[in-house]
């Protein structure tokens, strides 16, 4: 190919940015899944603890023990509320990361399309030059044969 793609540095930069956006999106998705798992764990733990409270109530509890169960359930509820907010925040971060990835990918595809078009144009030019060389060679070959026939 005669001419190098003039936007190759930009194409390389866009590829690097897209790779970084992909890596970052992977981290955001993993963080969101981790936050969801923690929330699920807290909700399961609360359900188990509430079941223990009901079982203890059927067997009889002292007012102090009942208060301890209720206080602990309130703390678990607070933790669930905080973790729910963390999940919401993590979802927003993931959505933002997806938008960033889409934008970087869109830019990369635009530059990559230009690169492919450039390569195609260069191949067409190269093919025309090769054809011209072959045609000239063929003309010379027949011209030499024609001179031999005249002699």
Mark where each language-model region is.
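Charge-rich amphipathic alpha-helical interaction elements
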Residues: 1-151
